[in-house]
């Protein structure tokens, strides 16, 4: 047999660079493969039936067909270390697949020997059609040098194998006949499992081979290769393969069929790969009409775009217009120059900057199936949902958690994809039923059909995979996208459950939402994935936008139904680790004595807690503060990247999502300054120029309205601050966008910087009301509110109202838990059986003792600046019962500190505002009511604030006088009494009080040491009598004593007593204006 000197390029690539032999691998293997293929058998003409004169072509296997097939399998293993896959190319050239298909069809029903031959042939078919992961192959050979491998020819060969396999239904029918006897056995041994697995893998391989991409006018082979997947699905349905898949999936929890759940998962993923649930739910009879309507709409949109360009210079009527400037003369050869802006036309002639094309990924390779195939999949999908989805997914998740060897990393992606597909498909079916027959027909498809993936254990595993993919270096983008899409559909499922008419669904949705939102990591992930988008695929961009839109919408809806929310937030372990390292380093430097190693206890290290393990703390949560976190430049860049593709949006939904997220930033977070950039304004101009091609939907109108609002704000700000035009060229850091165009605070103060240092040394300005006005608390609050509101700092008041609402909700929860209500219906009794006095609107002492101090923690830079250096806002905080800790002194530190460290500590204490624990809920509620009333009807100031307020004198810090040389005894190190400074009367009184207290304490200790039982009994009887008298007095006269044990003083009439800046809570409540 003569071989060609140079094989065709498709089958004979250039030999690998690492082979130095005179004959390459092709010349070595091809003769052997061709010889073995010829020995397999051949076709002959057979008269059937005999003496009929009718002949048909029948394949006759050779006498040694079984041995030849085994030799071919040995040759196939030669490709294990060959990147070029030379043996596979030789087998394609020798047309081995044609022989193997004929052997399977001919020998499958020829008894035991025929089954054995057919199984070996099926093994080779599975090897030849095994999916080729081109990306993974290229990644593996990347480090081996300049290896050039022609994978396109291998993929083309597999496509021809698939076409050969689907010419008739006999090959698939023969493979099914090999599996059925093994499936029918009640107890399957290892051989039966291998036969079933082999048949399923052959079907999986055929489904994995992608169709060729052909134009609408393609004919012949191109048109045939573009519809192979539809033909395969049709044959699988006619040969009951789909029913077999349903059986295996529904029995995946059985011991004998559980080994096949992973391969069934792979098959189902390949069946539904590239199919949109929205297309599957449509009436397939109307699909051609809808497709034609979409094409006409696309053509109309393109014509509308072209009409704006107008005629060119090659049109029938030429037009030439000259544009003259001060030093230039420009000639325009366009008819549109008559009516269009010349500057705009000149911009069109500029060289366009090349835009990097966004790539698509594996999850978005859509297929175009025939109507018959889609009808089959509609029935199969509905049956899969009703029969086996929960059972099948549960078995897969159980195997994943148990880390069985059959589970591969790619199986996670398949679970996510199928789950998101079937959840979306179920929701679309329910929506369709709701439109047709109302809510009664929804019982036909309950939401519990996909309940398994919505279980909390499944959601936790899903989020764990999302975090792992996010933390990987490099990130696993495909699996991350599948996680996000599945998470989005689970959220939509929970949202549908919350609005269901079934009370059980509503209750489950409430529990799931509480557990989801309690974990702050889930909420933070929505912000992270949107913020960290760079240059990933288009489908990934669409997924993260959809995820953020759904999560924010549902979280806002849920938060409106709750008076307060709490979240479990991870602590900053990185900061703790730094502090721990610094402390250990300092201790090491000071350490004078070290313990020898032989005396060390190794067991202590083993049982020591893991200091690097993440720790969590519970925090109050408000949706407004979380929503403001989306007002970042990185998030804006992601939204604008998505918005740039507005002409490619498939329907109004993508536009609705991006406009909704932009609305949250601009309107609700008041972050329109983030869009004051030149690149953003260019995008807005493109949209406004092409708004006539936008779909006629409410989302398009909302987009135009939002853009107009941003532009109006921008130009209004430019008119006020021209420097905004310069700021529009730079990025907007956090906190900077609210002060775009504002002047710097570091201007020259004409004192060589001394004024700034003096202000820093003096600390923040403290204000107080002038005493002669004698304002009530409500009047003081209205004045402070009017000043802050007039300065445009209304967002600070909204923020402090949110903080007070959090504190109020926390304290009310303690009161309800402890007292069972603020006003009890029955008198309670204490431990001694005595009836307690009713507290009309006041919590019990036990509830008050459980109150904790609330530390004010500003998050944004504006809030930090306000609590630190805004005197009017600090005055309002004092009126709201907030307080500051006393400034630290040198004696407060155990070790000597430098002046810089002391100044830093004092600076921190000036902004460490806290709400004391003894502030009652009623006072907080009254403060909130007053602020909300002022927000609805802002008060106005008739007088100048300078006439109402004045600067509060800061208390001078007294220093301890150092002892003089004469008063110091060098021998004893003490100060001589005779040389001590003379004490004033106030110091004498303080010293006497201390001595008296010490004497009483000593007397008390001596009395307690007395062990006379009679004296002890008289003491307790006397105490019991006094307690009864106090209870009777309290019941008759209310509460004559204040909380601190001081009798309330009457106001003086001599004008010397002024209204305090922060009156007691009990006094404030009577002065409030509601």
Swiss-Prot record:
Coiled coil: none annotated. Keywords: Cell cycle, DNA damage, DNA repair, DNA replication inhibitor, Meiosis, Nucleus. Residues 1014-1031 have a biased composition (Basic and acidic residues). Pfam families: TIMELESS (PF04821). InterPro entries: Timeless, Timeless_N. Its main location: nucleus. Residues 572-595, 936-1074 are annotated as: Disordered. Residues 948-962, 978-991, 1046-1055 have a biased composition (Basic residues). Signal peptide: none annotated. It is found in: Nucleus. GO terms for biological process: DNA repair; DNA replication checkpoint signaling; meiotic cell cycle; replication fork arrest. One of its GO terms (cellular component) is replication fork protection complex. GO terms for molecular function: DNA binding. Involved in chromosome segregation during meiosis and DNA damage repair. Belongs to the timeless family. This is Topoisomerase 1-associated factor 1. It comes from Cryptococcus neoformans var. neoformans serotype D (strain JEC21 / ATCC MYA-565). The gene is TOF1.
């Amino acid at each position: 047999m003569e071989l060609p000197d140079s094989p065709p390029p498709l089958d004979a690539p250039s030999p690998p660079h690492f082979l130095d032999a005179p004959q390459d691998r092709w010349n070595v293997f091809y003769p052997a493969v061709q010889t073995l293929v010829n020995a397999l058998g051949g076709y002959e003409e057979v008269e059937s039936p005999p003496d009929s004169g009718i002949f048909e072509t029948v394949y006759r296997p050779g006498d040694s067909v079984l041995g030849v097939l085994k030799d071919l399998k040995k040759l196939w293993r030669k490709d294990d270390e060959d990147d070029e896959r030379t043996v596979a190319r030789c087998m394609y050239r020798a047309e081995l697949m044609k022989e193997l298909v004929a052997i399977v069809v001919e020998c499958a029903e020829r008894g035991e020997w025929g089954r054995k031959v057919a199984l070996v042939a099926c093994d080779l078919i599975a090897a030849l059609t095994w999916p080729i992961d081109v990306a993974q192959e290229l990644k593996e050979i990347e480090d081996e040098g300049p290896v050039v491998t022609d994978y396109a020819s291998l993929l083309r060969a597999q496509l021809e194998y698939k076409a050969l396999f689907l010419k008739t239904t006999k090959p698939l029918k023969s493979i099914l006949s090999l599996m059925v006897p093994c499936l029918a056995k009640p107890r399957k041994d290892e051989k039966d499992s291998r036969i079933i697995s082999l048949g399923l893998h052959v079907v999986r391989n055929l489904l994995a081979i992608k169709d060729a991409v052909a134009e609408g006018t393609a004919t012949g082979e191109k048109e045939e290769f573009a519809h192979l997947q539809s033909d395969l699905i049709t044959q699988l349905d006619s040969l009951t393969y789909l029913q077999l898949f349903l059986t295996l999936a529904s029995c995946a929890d059985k011991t004998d069929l559980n080994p096949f759940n992973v391969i069934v998962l792979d098959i189902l993923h390949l069946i539904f790969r590239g199919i949109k649930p929205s297309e599957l739910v449509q009436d397939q009879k109307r699909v051609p009409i809808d497709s034609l309507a979409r094409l006409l709409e696309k053509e109309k949109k393109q014509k509308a775009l072209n009409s704006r360009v107008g005629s060119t210079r090659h049109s029938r009527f030429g037009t030439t217009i000259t544009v003259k400037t001060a030093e230039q003369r420009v000639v325009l050869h366009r008819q549109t120059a008559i009516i269009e802006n010349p500057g705009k036309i000149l911009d069109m002639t500029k060289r366009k900057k090349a835009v990097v094309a966004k790539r698509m990924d594996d999850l978005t390779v859509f297929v175009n199936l025939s109507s018959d195939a889609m009808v089959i999949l509609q029935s199969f999908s509905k049956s899969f949902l009703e029969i086996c989805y929960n059972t099948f997914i549960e078995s897969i998740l159980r195997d994943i958690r148990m880390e069985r060897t059959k589970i591969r990393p790619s199986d996670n992606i398949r679970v996510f994809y199928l789950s998101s597909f079937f959840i979306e498909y179920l929701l679309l079916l329910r929506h369709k039923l709701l439109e047709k027959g109302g809510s009664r027909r929804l019982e036909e498809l309950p939401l519990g059909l996909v309940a398994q993936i919505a279980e909390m254990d499944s959601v936790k595993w899903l989020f764990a995979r999302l975090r792992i993919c996010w933390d990987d270096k490099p990130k696993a983008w495909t699996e991350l996208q599948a996680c996000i899409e599945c998470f989005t559909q689970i959220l939509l499922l929970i949202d549908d459950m919350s609005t269901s008419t079934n009370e059980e669904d509503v209750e489950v949705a409430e529990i799931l939402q509480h557990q989801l939102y309690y974990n702050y990591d889930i909420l933070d992930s929505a912000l992270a994935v949107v913020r960290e988008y760079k240059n990933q695929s288009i489908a990934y961009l669409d997924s993260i936008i959809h995820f953020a839109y759904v999560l924010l919408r549902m979280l806002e809806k849920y938060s409106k139904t709750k008076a307060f929310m709490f979240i479990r937030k991870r602590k900053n372990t990185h900061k703790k680790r730094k502090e721990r390292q610094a402390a250990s380093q300092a201790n090491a430097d000071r350490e004078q004595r070290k313990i020898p190693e032989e005396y060390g206890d190794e067991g202590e290290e083993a049982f020591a807690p893991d200091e690097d393990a993440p720790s969590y703390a519970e925090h109050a949560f408000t949706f407004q503060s979380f929503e403001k976190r989306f007002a970042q430049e990185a998030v804006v860049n992601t939204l604008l990247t998505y918005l740039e593709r507005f002409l490619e949006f498939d329907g109004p939904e993508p536009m609705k999502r991006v406009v909704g997220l932009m609305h949250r930033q601009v309107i609700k977070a008041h972050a329109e300054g983030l869009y004051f950039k030149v690149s953003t304004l260019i995008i807005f101009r493109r949209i406004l120029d092409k708004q006539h091609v936008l779909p006629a939907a409410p989302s398009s109108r909302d987009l135009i309205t939002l853009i107009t609002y941003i532009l109006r704000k921008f130009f209004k700000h430019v008119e006020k601050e021209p420097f905004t035009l310069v700021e529009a060229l730079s990025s907007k850091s956090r906190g900077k966008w609210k002060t775009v165009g504002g002047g710097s605070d570091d201007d020259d103060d004409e004192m060589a910087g001394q004024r700034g240092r003096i202000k820093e040394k003096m600390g923040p300005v403290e204000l107080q009301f002038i005493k002669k006005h004698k304002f009530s608390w409500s009047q003081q609050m209205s004045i402070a509110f009017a000043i802050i509101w007039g300065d445009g700092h209304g967002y600070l008041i909204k923020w402090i109202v949110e903080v007070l609402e959090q504190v109020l909700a926390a304290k009310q929860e303690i009161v309800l838990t402890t007292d069972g209500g603020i006003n009890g219906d029955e008198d309670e009794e204490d431990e001694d059986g005595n009836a307690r006095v009713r507290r009309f609107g006041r919590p019990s002492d036990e509830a008050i003792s459980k109150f904790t101090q609330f530390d004010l923690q500003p998050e944004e830079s504006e809030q930090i600046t306000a609590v630190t250096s805004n005197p009017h806002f600090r005055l309002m905080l004092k009126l709201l019962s907030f307080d500051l800790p006393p400034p630290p002194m040198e004696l407060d530190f155990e070790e000597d500190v430098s002046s810089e460290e002391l100044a830093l500590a004092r600076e921190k204490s000036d902004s460490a505002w806290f709400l004391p624990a003894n502030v009652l809920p009623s006072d907080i509620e009254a403060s909130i009511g007053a602020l909300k009333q002022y927000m609805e009807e802002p008060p106005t100031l008739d007088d100048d604030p300078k006439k109402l307020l004045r600067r509060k004198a800061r208390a001078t810090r007294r220093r301890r006088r150092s002892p003089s040389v004469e008063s110091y005894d060098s021998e004893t190190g003490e100060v001589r009494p005779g040389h001590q400074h003379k004490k004033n009367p106030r110091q004498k009184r303080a010293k006497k009080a201390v001595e008296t207290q010490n004497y009483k304490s000593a007397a008390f200790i001596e009395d307690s040491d007395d062990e006379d039982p009679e004296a002890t009994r008289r003491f307790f009887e006397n105490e019991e009598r006094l307690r009864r008298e106090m209870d009777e007095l309290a019941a008759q006269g209310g509460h004559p004593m204040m909380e601190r044990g001081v009798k309330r003083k009457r106001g003086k009439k001599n004008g010397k007593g002024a209204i305090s800046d922060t009156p007691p809570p009990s006094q404030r409540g009577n002065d409030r204006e509601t």
